[in-house]
């Protein structure tokens, strides 16, 4: 009977860009890869397994993160990107056969790069980002305000659990940055507030397109710009056109899990 090897897996330290916490992650083993393969059936299941895979990879974590739920509540989506990068880097390192479509001639070609050569990070240095929120008035829907925040993994888990179907997934994810929408009457009186997720989605769908773009511009300026980027300069193999390519970390992570 197999009783286990005495193996010390490679480790990598990650400082999360938005909550500024230090974690040491270890590389995946084959069993964990197999679990991830089995999870890729529904978005909710894949998301849950990915979160647990990252959490289980921690060799060292902050004292304030005692449980899995505590980690979900104290980790932003942008922080998870950084932790996933650390897990990817220590497990696979190379980004192999990444398909790029040229913006000039529109032909596809494959490239291989080291993940570390594409990495850059901008940290949030203005205190506790998780409990911060701000109101912004919408430019077209006058007197309507959106309260914007940086969503956590817990927010995402709750939204996925309550979604109305796979077709709703994109809009559930899209509206995680909105804590509530409310309208203040011009004549005074109480505001009409929509803070339940389904009400937020219905209200969001009624907004003008310019209002939607305004919400995301404000989110990016206050929160979204803080995180990691995986960018590389690439030259088209067909026409020689050079352009900056942004790498899809989650998609590439699952692609590597499925490769031999």
Residue ranges and their predicted role:
Residues 1-260:
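Short, surface-exposed, charged amphipathic helix/loop patches that serve as local interaction elements
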